[in-house]
């Protein structure tokens, strides 16, 4: 078998008949499979042992040779080679066909490759292949030309003969008529009798003339057809063809079926055809040119690849190894078999029958029918159902053909090659493990024992608990007490990987150090839940064990949970306190008055009556007061601190030279807040204030930016412990009694009900219409809901647990409290419109039957939406991964001078709109500017260089840029990166997950796809109704899909193609807009613009208004409401314009949902969408006009052409949707495993495509290490040099090398001496 590590590319091509015979070990001649009595394969059948190898290891079929000693011998009795039965997975056979057949992929695929090659319409081709029409394969032009006069004379003679016969017949008939009339005359017949005879004679004579005329016409047709006869001419009329064959068979050859096609292909001159097609392309126009271009693609593919086009017509077909199409016996003695065996059996039966008919010399019509059936059976074997009705098995189920085995989710690619199951894994339910450290997980003992079984067995033998592996295995299975101690050692410092499906981003798999626990559930650290999106309501997780030292090192260094605190999408920490922990820390840092519980012992000023109270000389003293019950946790106090750093302003004031540990300062704070600050690093400035979720996030973000990961991990762990501790002690729980109901709610609702009645009366009197009533009622009841809600909010005291949970940011929001205690308010129906009767009750009071019914519409739609969204989001992620999977950081710096211009800050204006000289951050700088390298010096407002080119922008640099008033910067971006495949580290910038410059080998494409796809489920499915807009404005997930697929939006808006003033003309149903360009060029007119869609709005000075006559518009500005078409944006604004448009539009959708994603992730996908260009003029290059090529390849080819004095290639930028871009990838393996498998493979085979194995998918498919991370080529040849201590420790193993390792008396006893490696040459 091939070793995947010994080849660098994989090529696919067309197999010729000789190739198929060379692969084969013998011909399958019989349709039989297994003898049902002996259960042995039939000789020459589909499972024949002589062809495919023995069914039992080292044993021939007849049993003459058994055992391995006869290896390689071929039995003279049964002809079976003595070898391993595994060869039945590799050895192929073949079927010699009695008549050639076409390969359905090349004939029936779209476009039909055979049709393009031979210039035949697919319909005509089908008629020929399936014996419904004849085709001329060759014509002897010279012979026809030289004999034409003779043949013409013969034809004229024949025509003359026909005419003479006609005349003779007519004369005879006329004579007979005269005689008949004379007889009647003599007999004195009446006139009508004579007339009858006359009419009959006339009719007969007319028939004679018509017959002769038809005969002459037929002869003319035969002659004209013969004179114009040309190769590839189809003759559908069977009798005409027979006549031609009778008369002129020496001058032409023809036929029907695949044989005729085979003859045409063999006579086909590819080079001459290519030349004539190029001529047509040069001189032709319109459809003719287009067809020539398409045909040239196919012809050039065969020329370039060296494939023999005859491979599209098969003389023999391969039979795949029997183990890949097995037949197994079921319990009842019946057999279950693969569908392929049925399909092969049909082919063999029909083939044998055809052979027999040919031997018997059967009539041509019967033979042709049998050939057609053979063709159909081969079609069904290759691709069942592609043409006509599929062949069905029992129960009318279509049989699975070879193509079906590759296609779809259950096909070979996605099911077996990209979705392998792995050993050393287990799964169980997860429960919370609050006592764990961030890098730990609790592993059930039984599961750990099974996972680490080989390691435990090895240790048991090493420690002499067991004599050999077999007894060690028995000990493990019986769970002897010694096993548990050994297991503890085996798992020490051996990380395991936990995974929760669905793995939406890379933090869905993380490594943890296992801690053995009782029970059968896996314990998960509470802070890891956010990344896994896990909760403890029955979720399950899988455990995987990294085996090799390299895998363990990767798991520990790269995947350990404590090293993966930041989100790769936005760079924000994910391991944050949540839920109970947030409530606990919020409670800890609250401040309470003296009279409240928890506020006792608060600070009071010194008076004449006595000294100040609530002042403490040290933290210890305050804690002692708290323990005695004198001081409350949340009471404001003054305390002297010397072990925590003071806030920045206190430090600046009291310690100008900087604070040192041990220096004291007085804090006005609470005991709880001091305890909170003790959880943070000692040199982090003291944090004062109530710590709700937002503030906690600010602190942790700050820590992540300024401290090493290990410190952050320890800090969040401490916060988790304190959070749980104080949440328990705060007594925050929810009971029915905590839900307070508004006492005067009924009165409020009665007021609004009266207003609603007034609106209904207005409708009845015709003062308002239906839509105005609807809008008025919706507004009224929304106002009522808000009023009730706000009243409820005021009703709750601060110490009520429900608002406490909401205010701390742990869970829920105020609107949920309104629903719980106020009123539910307006609900929607399944169409998304409001039901005008609101739900007036709260959940505390309970809903009435009608209210419950109304409410269930919207709830049901919500659930259905969620289900649809999950599937759609998953499919989007799959397409994104596919398009970006080969974007890997390949080099440190591509050296480009290009970059993108980004906004950093905006001037702050005063009330009069004048500049104040100060600057504020521009919107969204965190997701656009941070983490990038400067491509040019950043110049401040005063002209000084603030940051030089090549600086990476972090929080500090950003603050400097804003302070200096740098409004825009030019930064490096993946969209302008010069690296041919993948991107360079400098253009990508900092990795969001580490905060450092991205390393070479990082799979940034997949990280980008995951970052965009992972929040996809949170996006809404809804399309928004905007009043008066033609159709709906798409939003949420469908909008993201529309953008990435580069589709024309539903409510498409035209965009201004020039800068200029706008003139609006308004007729009944449409607008006509005219732009008068600033540069005085020709006016641009946009006609028939829908009024329903409405004019675009302009935002001026915070006020939005529609476009007006005389307004100035900029190039690229939308003229109507709706969305711009990306293809239009590309045409008007160019590549850079459309890139920015797509990024802004995608970000708009995510920002609406409050999801932070860095622009660079979207940039990577957009870069892949704009990678290809269309060749308009090929210049001096090899490209065909109209073909899609890689932009970087086109640039390289142009440079090469110009060097040699040629013309460069002329191209047009293209924007491709992600599905199309995935299928247009260089790698045919990756494209075939994505979608349209058969089409991709057909195309790849004709072009003899070579897969360079650059991306990730293609390497996974063939089983190689992926070329990313540590698997990239530059890291592959690293040698590890062990230290002497490591060598000694690693090799203290039982060994049989020479003396000295074992005592002389007890041979086989282990002495524990280390193996001297130097003598063995192992290093």
From Swiss-Prot:
It catalyses: RNA(n) + a ribonucleoside 5'-triphosphate = RNA(n+1) + diphosphate. It is an enzyme of class 2 (transferase). It comes from the Bacteria. InterPro entries: DNA-dir_RpoC_beta_prime, DNA-dir_RpoC_beta_prime_bact, RNA_pol_asu, RNA_pol_N, RNA_pol_Rpb1_1, RNA_pol_Rpb1_3, RNA_pol_Rpb1_3_sf, RNA_pol_Rpb1_4. GO terms for cellular component: DNA-directed RNA polymerase complex. Its EC number is 2.7.7.6. Binds 1 Mg(2+) ion per subunit. Binds 2 Zn(2+) ions per subunit. Keywords: DNA-directed RNA polymerase, Magnesium, Metal-binding, Nucleotidyltransferase, Transcription, Transferase, Zinc. GO terms for biological process: DNA-templated transcription. Gene3D superfamilies: 1.10.132.30, 1.10.150.390, 1.10.1790.20, 1.10.40.90, 2.40.40.20, 2.40.50.100, RNA polymerase II, clamp domain, RNA polymerase Rpb1, domain 3. Mg(2+) binds at residues 535, 537, 539. Zn(2+) 2 binds at residues 894, 977, 984, 987. Its cofactor is Mg(2+); Zn(2+). Pfam families: RNA_pol_Rpb1_1, RNA_pol_Rpb1_2, RNA_pol_Rpb1_3, RNA_pol_Rpb1_4, RNA_pol_Rpb1_5. GO terms for molecular function: DNA binding; DNA-directed RNA polymerase activity; magnesium ion binding; zinc ion binding. CDD domains: RNAP_beta'_C (cd02655), RNAP_beta'_N (cd01609). Zn(2+) 1 binds at residues 60, 62, 75, 78. The RNAP catalytic core consists of 2 alpha, 1 beta, 1 beta' and 1 omega subunit. When a sigma factor is associated with the core the holoenzyme is formed, which can initiate transcription. Belongs to the RNA polymerase beta' chain family. DNA-dependent RNA polymerase catalyzes the transcription of DNA into RNA using the four ribonucleoside triphosphates as substrates. This is DNA-directed RNA polymerase subunit beta'. It comes from Corynebacterium urealyticum (strain ATCC 43042 / DSM 7109). The gene is rpoC.
């Amino acid at each position: 078998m091939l070793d995947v590590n010994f080849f660098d590319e994989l090529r696919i091509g067309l197999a010729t008949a000789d190739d198929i015979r060379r692969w084969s070990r013998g011909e399958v001649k019989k349709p039989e499979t297994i003898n049902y009595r002996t259960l042995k394969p039939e000789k020459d059948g589909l499972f024949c042992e002589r062809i495919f190898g023995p069914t039992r290891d080292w044993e021939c079929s007849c049993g003459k040779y058994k055992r391995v000693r006869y290896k390689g011998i071929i039995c003279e009795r049964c002809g079976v080679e003595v070898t391993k039965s595994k060869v039945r997975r590799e050895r192929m056979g073949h079927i010699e066909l009695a008549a050639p057949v076409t390969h359905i992929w090349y004939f029936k695929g779209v476009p039909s490759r055979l049709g393009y090659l031979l210039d035949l319409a697919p319909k005509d081709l089908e008629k020929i292949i399936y014996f419904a029409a004849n085709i001329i394969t060759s014509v002897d032009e010279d012979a026809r030309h030289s004999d034409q006069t003779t043949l013409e004379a013969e034809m004229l003679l024949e025509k003359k003969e026909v005419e003479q016969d006609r005349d003779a017949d007519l004369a005879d008939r006329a004579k007979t008529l005269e005689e008949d009339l004379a007889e009647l005359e003599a007999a004195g017949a009446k006139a009508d009798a004579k007339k009858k005879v006359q009419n009959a004679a006339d009719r007969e004579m007319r028939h004679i003339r018509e017959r002769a005329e038809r005969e002459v016409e037929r002869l003319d047709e035969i002659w004209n057809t013969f004179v114009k006869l040309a190769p590839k001419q189809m003759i559908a009329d069977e009798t005409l063809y027979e006549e031609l064959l009778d008369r002129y068979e020496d001058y032409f050859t023809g036929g029907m079926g695949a044989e005729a096609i085979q003859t045409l292909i063999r006579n086909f001159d590819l080079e001459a055809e290519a030349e004539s097609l190029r001529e047509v392309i040069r001189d032709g126009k319109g459809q003719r040119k287009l067809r020539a271009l398409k045909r040239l693609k196919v012809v050039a593919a065969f020329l370039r690849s060296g494939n023999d086009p005859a491979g599209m017509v098969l003389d023999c077909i391969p039979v795949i190894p029997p183990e890949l199409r097995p037949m197994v016996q079921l319990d009842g003695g019946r057999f279950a078999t693969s569908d392929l065996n049925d399909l092969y059996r049909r082919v063999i039966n029909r083939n044998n029958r055809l052979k027999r008919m040919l031997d018997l010399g059967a009539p041509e019509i019967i033979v042709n029918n049998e050939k057609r059936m053979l063709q159909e059976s081969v079609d069904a074997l290759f691709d069942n159902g592609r043409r006509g009705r599929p062949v069905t098995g029992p129960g009318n189920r279509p049989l699975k053909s070879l193509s079906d085995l590759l296609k779809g989710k259950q096909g070979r690619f996605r099911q077996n090659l990209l979705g392998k199951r792995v050993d050393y894994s287990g799964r169980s339910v997860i429960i919370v493990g609050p006592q764990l450290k961030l890098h730990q997980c609790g592993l059930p003992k039984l599961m750990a024992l099974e996972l680490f079984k080989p390691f435990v067995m090895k240790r048991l033998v090493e420690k002499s608990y067991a004599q050999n592996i077999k007894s060690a295995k028995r000990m493990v299975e019986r769970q002897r007490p010694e096993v548990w101690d050994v297991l503890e050692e085996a798992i020490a410092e051996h990380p395991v990987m936990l995974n929760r499906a669905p793995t939406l981003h890379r933090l869905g798999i993380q490594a943890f150090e296992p801690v053995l626990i009782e029970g059968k559930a896996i314990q998960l650290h509470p802070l890891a839940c956010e990344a896994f999106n896990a909760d403890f309501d029955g979720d399950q997780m899988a455990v995987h064990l990294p085996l090799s030292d390299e895998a363990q090192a990767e798991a520990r260094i790269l995947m350990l949970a404590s090293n993966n605190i930041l989100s790769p999408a936005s760079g924000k920490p994910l391991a944050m306190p949540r839920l109970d922990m947030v409530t606990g820390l919020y409670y800890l840092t609250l401040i309470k008055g003296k009279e409240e519980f928890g506020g006792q012992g608060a600070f009071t000023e010194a008076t004449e009556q006595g000294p100040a109270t609530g002042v403490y000389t040290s933290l210890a003293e305050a804690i002692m007061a708290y323990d005695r019950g004198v001081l409350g946790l949340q009471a404001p106090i003054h305390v002297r601190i010397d072990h925590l750093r003071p806030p920045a302003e206190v430090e600046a004031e009291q310690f100008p030279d900087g604070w040192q540990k041990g220096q004291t300062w007085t804090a006005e704070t609470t005991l709880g807040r001091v305890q909170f600050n003790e959880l943070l690093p000692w040199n982090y400035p003291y944090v004062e204030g109530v710590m709700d979720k937002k503030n906690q996030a600010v602190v942790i973000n700050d820590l992540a930016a300024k401290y090493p990961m290990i410190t952050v991990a320890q800090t969040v762990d401490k916060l988790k412990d304190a959070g749980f501790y104080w949440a328990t002690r705060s007594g925050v729980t929810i009971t029915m009694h905590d839900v307070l109901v508004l006492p005067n709610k009924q009165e409020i609702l009665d007021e609004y009900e009266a207003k609603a009645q007034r609106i209904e009366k207005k409708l009845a009197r015709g003062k308002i219409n239906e839509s105005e009533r609807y809008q008025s009622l919706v507004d009224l009841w929304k106002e009522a809901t808000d009023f009730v809600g706000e009243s409820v909010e005021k009703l709750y005291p601060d110490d009520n647990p429900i608002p406490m949970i909401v205010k701390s940011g742990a869970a829920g929001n105020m609107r949920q409290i309104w629903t719980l205690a106020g009123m539910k308010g307006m609900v929607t129906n399944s169409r998304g419109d409001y039901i005008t009767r609101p739900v007036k009750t709260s959940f505390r009071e309970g809903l009435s039957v009608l209210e419950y019914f109304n409410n269930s519409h919207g709830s049901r739609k919500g659930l259905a939406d969620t289900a649809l969204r999950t599937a759609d989001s998953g499919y989007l992620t799959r397409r994104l991964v596919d398009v970006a999977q080969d974007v890997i950081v390949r080099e440190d710096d591509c050296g480009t001078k290009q970059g993108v211009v980004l906004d950093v800050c905006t001037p702050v204006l005063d009330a009069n709109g004048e500049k104040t000289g100060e600057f504020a951050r521009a919107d969204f700088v965190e997701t656009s500017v941070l983490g990038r390298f400067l491509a040019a010096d950043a110049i401040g407002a005063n002209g000084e260089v603030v940051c030089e080119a090549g600086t990476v922008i972090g929080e500090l640099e950003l603050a400097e840029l804003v302070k200096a008033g740098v409004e825009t910067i030019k930064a490096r971006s993946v969209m302008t990166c010069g690296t041919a495949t993948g991107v360079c580290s400098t253009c990508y910038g900092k990795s969001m997950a580490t905060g450092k410059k991205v390393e070479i080998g990082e799979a940034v494409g997949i990280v980008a796809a995951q970052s965009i796809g992972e929040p996809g489920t949170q996006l809404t499915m809804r399309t928004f109704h905007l009043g008066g807009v033609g159709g709906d404005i798409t939003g949420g997930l469908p909008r993201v899909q529309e953008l990435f697929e580069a589709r024309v939006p539903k409510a498409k808006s035209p965009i201004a193609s020039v800068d200029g003033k706008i003139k609006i003309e308004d007729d009944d149903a449409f607008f006509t807009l005219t732009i008068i360009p600033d540069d005085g060029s020709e006016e641009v007119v946009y006609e028939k613009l829908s009024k329903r869609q409405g004019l675009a709005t302009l935002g001026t000075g915070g006020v939005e208004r529609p476009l007006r006559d005389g307004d100035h518009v900029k190039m690229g500005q939308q003229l109507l409401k709706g969305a711009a078409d990306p293809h239009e944006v590309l045409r008007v604004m160019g590549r850079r314009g459309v890139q920015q448009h797509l990024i802004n539009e995608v970000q708009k959708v995510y920002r609406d949902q409050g999801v932070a994603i860095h622009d660079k992730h979207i940039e990577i996908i957009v870069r892949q969408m704009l990678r290809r260009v269309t060749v308009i003029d090929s210049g001096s290059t090899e490209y065909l006009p109209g073909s899609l090529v890689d932009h970087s390849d086109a640039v390289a080819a142009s440079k090469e052409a110009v060097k040699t004095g040629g013309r460069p290639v002329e191209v047009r930028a293209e924007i491709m949707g992600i599905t199309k871009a995935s299928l247009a990838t260089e790698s045919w393996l990756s494209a075939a495993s994505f979608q349209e498998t058969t089409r991709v493979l057909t195309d790849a085979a004709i072009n003899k495509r070579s897969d360079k194995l650059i991306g990730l998918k293609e390497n996974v498919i063939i089983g190689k290490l992926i070329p990313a991370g540590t698997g990239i080529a530059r890291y592959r040849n690293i040698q590890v040099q062990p230290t002497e201590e490591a060598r000694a420790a690693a090799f203290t193993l039982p060994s049989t090398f020479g003396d000295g390792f074992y005592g002389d008396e007890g041979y086989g006893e282990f002495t524990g001496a280390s193996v001297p490696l130097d003598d063995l040459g192992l290093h």
